[in-house]
Structures are given as C-alpha cells and as structure tokens.
Amino acid sequence: AALYNREVDTTELLSKVNLLDKAQARPGNLSGGQQQRFSVACALVNSPKILFLDEPTTGLDPQAKHNLWDLVRELNEAGMTIVLTTHNMEEAESLCKRIAIMDHGKLVAEDTPQNLILKHAPEPPQAPLHGNIEDVFLALTGHGLRD
C-alpha cells in the first residue's frame, strides 16, 4: 500500500525539468546537472504544499538554470511555498519574495529584496545602476560569498 493514494504522472514531472528524453536512463548515468534536475522532479512527486530546494541550480548550464527558475516561478504562482537556499545572489533576488541572510548560522536580516537593498546597500550602490542583494550581503556580513 502506498502512503498517498495518488497517481504520479512521471512523464509530466520529467517534462517539467526537461528530462523526458532520459526517462529510461538510470539516475547514475545522468550528468551532474541532469541529476540535479531529476532531484527537483522527485521533490515534486505528490505535489507538496511546501517545496524545499537546496542550491537547486548548482551544476546547471545557463539555459537549464533559467528553465529551472521559470519552473520555480510557475510553481510559486500556482500557490506552492518554496524555501530556497542559495549562494547565488542573482538567483535569490530574481526568485524570492522574501530573503533571509544568514551569517555563521545566525539570521542577520530578513525582508523583501527591495527593502533589504534600500536599508542595507552601501551608498552609492556598488552596482552600476542600483544596489543588489550581493551588496546587502557584503554590508551585513563583512565578507564575500566564499569567505
């Protein structure tokens, strides 16, 4: 007996992450980026109300990354709550309605991307046209993303 009494359309899940052509492949035979996308498809089984994604675009080429960003937006617009961890500030700023910045395991700031930029980006912003979340991270933590 299954835990959930729902049919899962694996074709649809694989299609969402652009892996339909790999439907017969064993996970160990997939590239790193394909394995990453496969793990997202697995996380979508049974349509969770909350989706946890840990560094979901690590190892993805630029096209696959943007395709996954589109999927995350689509899922969120359909009402799914998504908790995303990332070191990619562009990704956080692009996908997240709210951002929590952690430093050494402590929450140092949490707000909308725009409010974080308004409150914490250095003046004048280091970005050519406006401040960004990376400027905020640097201002709040005092170190770069890889320090």
How should these model regions be labeled?
Residues 110-111:
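ABC ATPase "signature
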Residues 26-30:
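Conserved ABC ATPase signature
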Residues 40:
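Hydrophobic anchor residue at the start of the ABC signature
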Residues 51-54:
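Catalytic Walker B motif of ABC-type/P-loop ATPase nucleotide-binding domains
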